Swiss-Prot record:
CDD domains given in the database record: SfsA-like_bacterial
Domain of life of the source: Bacteria
This protein's name: Sugar fermentation stimulation protein homolog
Example GO molecular function: DNA binding
GN (gene name): sfsA
Pfam families in the cross-refs: SfsA, SfsA_N
Length: 238
């Protein structure tokens, strides 16, 4: 995924009302931009940090600029735009970056499935193999006090994420292939674990899903102001 023109940078003043953030340029100009992330954004929205934003050419948008990246005091870059996770996953699958997901003929997105009225992020199909259901999650929470490079998901209690695990478990039990794909959108994260200390129920459901045959994949993104792409697998640690 390339950014043309390249992302512009400014300093974060504050994030508020979930969808908005105020930024300041070197010349003192203050601007309100859109924040495409309704989550906790733990460690991703510290006032004073550098941020990068894109600009839409849609004249109807009230806030044409969208917050894309943050940079921490340690120099780590984080993609905070949650929409990018699915886009990067689709791009990586189509370019055969994710070796575990090669060999399928058809890729569909947002397909209805399951008993809890869900939509799967990505559905892969081929005539010679079971359907492959892929739920994509972005990982941006770095543990800055414990093991070096340890990332966690989720960063807050997620009943929606719990539902997705139940749906994936059902798919695996019914003979389909079921994948939980963590897209790691924080340059400082080198391994991922379930955040039992944040959402114990999610952690338990994930273990049950794995026992039922759900596969867990983690792929890390390379992040810059001109391009984002998934580049390599990293470990998931139970």
């Amino acid at each position: 995924m390339q950014f043309k023109p390249a992302l512009e940078s400014a300093t974060l003043l504050k994030r508020y009302k979930r969808f908005l953030a105020d930024i300041e340029f070197d010349n003192g100009e203050v601007r309100t931009i859109h924040c495409a992330n309704t989550g906790a954004m733990t460690g991703c929205a510290t006032p004073g940090n550098k941020v990068w934003f894109s600009t839409s050419d849609n004249p109807k948008r009230k806030y044409p600029n969208s917050w894309e990246l943050s940079e921490t005091e340690q120099g780590h870059r984080i993609c905070i735009n949650t929409a990018r996770a699915n886009q990067l996953a689709v791009e990586a699958i189509e370019n055969n970056v994710i070796s575990e997901l090669c060999g399928y003929d058809t890729l569909q997105t947002e397909v209805k499935y399951g008993n809890e009225n869900s939509r799967i992020d990505i559905l892969l199909s081929a005539s010679d193999k079971p359907k492959c259901y892929i739920e994509v999650k972005s990982v941006t929470l770095l543990d800055e006090t414990g093991s070096a490079g340890q990332g966690y998901f989720p960063d807050a209690v997620t009943t929606r994420g719990q539902k997705h695990l139940r749906e994936l478990t059902e798919m695996a039990q019914n003979g389909s292939r079921a994948i939980l794909l963590f897209t790691v959108l924080h340059s400082g994260i080198e391994k991922v674990s379930a955040a039992h200390h944040i959402d114990a129920k999610y952690s338990l459901l994930l273990k049950q899903a794995q026992d039922a045959g759900v596969e867990v994949l983690c792929y890390k993104a390379e992040l810059s102001n001109t391009e984002m792409k998934l580049i390599s697998a990293i470990d998931f640690i139970n």
